[in-house]
A protein has these predicted regions:
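Conserved PLP-enzyme active-site core in the AAT-like
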Residues: 1-134
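Active-site C-terminal subdomain of aminotransferase-like
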Residues: 83, 92-187
Length: 187
């Protein structure tokens, strides 16, 4: 919906009979005027896109970006890292993945994570990892950012709750929660 709202022409890539998106179907849609593709992984059927590396490679070879809908991120937390799968950008639904209330009494919170390829375009302020620590970036000097965000970043309480959830579970607990989510989805 957002892509259409800002003037992009949106086309669907059909899934195969197995419920998965195949690289050949993606390649048919790619061309010089394609800015990005969006894929939910695991998809709405609960299936992990087995050919995600080939899809990412095809998208990048066409000069486009690979955006991942993080709606089902809870199934891969601690198991796979989206950047390692070739994803350039992904939004994270805190209420689906990190146990925050939907909206929490105010605007929701859906952080967006970017690959190094897109980091230079992030509006300020944003956080980035530098030398093993988080750094707050508030200056657009040396970047290609389109400016400073003037809207809210989301409901701050949701970020605190999500962080508390992550810290209380730790890496092993988050991985176990993901494995349990997959088991439940396939039951």
């Amino acid at each position: 919906a957002t892509a259409a709202l800002i003037g992009f022409e949106v086309q669907s890539v059909p899934a195969g009979e197995d419920g998965l998106v195949h690289p050949a179907a993606v390649r048919e849609k790619l061309g010089p005027h394609v800015a990005a593709i969006m894929l939910t992984n695991p998809n709405t059927c609960g299936l992990f896109e087995r050919e995600i590396f080939e899809i990412a490679e095809a998208v990048h070879q066409a000069g486009a970006y690979f955006y991942c809908d993080g709606a089902n991120f809870n199934a891969i937390v601690g198991v796979a890292r989206p950047g390692d799968l070739g994803v350039d950008a992904m939004h994270i639904n805190l209420h689906k993945t990190f146990s925050t209330p939907h909206g929490g009494g105010g605007p929701g919170s859906g952080p967006v994570v970017l690959s190094e390829r897109l980091a230079a375009f992030a509006p300020v302020p944003f956080l980035r990892e530098k030398e093993g620590a988080l750094e707050l970036v508030e200056d657009t000097e040396g970047s290609q950012a389109f400016g400073r965000m003037t809207a809210f970043h989301g409901q701050m309480g949701m970020y605190v709750r999500a962080l508390a959830y992550m810290l209380s579970h730790g890496g092993d607990g988050l991985r176990q929660a993901s494995q349990d989510a997959v088991l439940n989805a396939n039951y």
